[in-house]
Amino acid sequence: MALFLGASSFVFAGTEPQIETPTQQTELQRGGGGIILKDENSHDLFSIESTYTLRSDFKDEPRLGHGDSFYGDFSYDHRFLITGKWYFRAGVEYERFDFDGSDNGLPDHLQTFHGHFALEYVVHDHAGAGLELDPGAYYQDDITGDAVDIPWKIFVSFPLKKDKIFGVIGLGGALYQDPVVAPGGGLIWLFSDKMRLEGVFPKPALVYNPTDDWQIRLQGELVYESFRTDDVVTPLQKLQVHNAVVQYNEDRAGVQVSYSGFEPFKITAGAGCTFIRAFDFFRVGVREKLDPAPYFRISLDAKF
C-alpha cells in the first residue's frame, strides 16, 4: 500500500483533478473578418505556495531529537495550442523543504529545480489526459550528475456515468523513487453543482463550492519526493552515508478555503495535521519518522 501511494504522488503531482461537464472548448465570435474561434483555456499558469509543519519528536529514536519543516514552491507554465483541445505545456518549478530542530545530521534542507514538459488534452482549464516529464536536479546542496532525475507521469480520465461519475487511471515513475514505477487512480463523483468527491490520490478531497468565488475542501495529501543528499552522519550507526538517495514524505489531512473573486487570482489558506513525516533512505533500509504535528498553508494561483 505504501509503495502504491508513494508512486501515485508522481502520477498526479501538481494537479487538482476536477471534471467540467461542458464539452465545448471554444466559443464563436463575429469580427470584421467573419467568425473567429476563441480559446477558453488559460495559457499562462502561475503558482506559489508555503506550508509550515510545527515541531514534533522523532518516533522511536530519541537520539534524533525533534524537528519542524517549511515547504516552499514556485511554478510557472505556458500552454501552446497544438490542435483542437490538445496542448503542449512547458514551464519551470522550484521546490524546497527546510528543516529546523535538533542538530542530528539529517539534511537541513532538500530542493529541486526542474522543468515541465507535457502533452495534455484540456477542457475548460482542466487536463483530462496527459503525459508529462519533469527533468531536473533533485538535490541537497550540490548539483551533480547523479542528482538529475526525470520523474514522469501519464494519466487519463473517462466517464463511468455521464456527467456524474468519472474514473482516473495513471502510471508514474522516477529513477530515484521507490518503487521506480507504480500505478495510481481513483474516482470523481459529482453529487451536485456545489459538491463533489475527488477520490484521486495524492490529494483526495470532499469539495464544496457555496458560491462561484468560494471553495471549501476537506482534503488529504500524500507528498513523496526523492533527492540526492550530501553527507548524512547521524548518531545512529545504521545511518551514516554519503551521496545517498532519500525519499522524503509528508502525509496530512485538513481543511482549506479558497477565494477566486480577484480574477485571475485564487487565494488559499489551510490548516490541519501532518500525521507522518519521514526520511526514507530506502537503499540502505533506514526510515526515520516524526510524530504528528499541526500544519498551516497559504498559496496564490493565477491563470490567464
Functional labels for PLM-detected ranges:
Residues 46-54, 90-96, 131-137, 169-173, ...:
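Transmembrane beta-barrel strands of outer-membrane/channel proteins
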Residues 1-8:
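Bacterial N-terminal signal peptides
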Residues 82-88, 125-131, 163-168, 194-197, ...:
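Repeated loop/turn-to-beta-strand initiation elements of outer-membrane beta-barrel proteins
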Residues 185-189, 194, 255-263, 289-304:
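Outer-membrane beta-barrel "beta-signal"
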Residues 96-105, 202-285, 289, 294:
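Outer-membrane beta-barrel translocator/channel fold
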Residues 76-80, 119-121, 158-160, 173, ...:
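Residue-level signature of outer-membrane beta-barrel architecture
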Residues 63-68, 107-109, 140-147, 172-181, ...:
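Solvent-exposed loop/turn segments connecting transmembrane beta-strands
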Residues 17-149, 243-252, 285:
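Transmembrane beta-barrel domains of bacterial outer-membrane proteins
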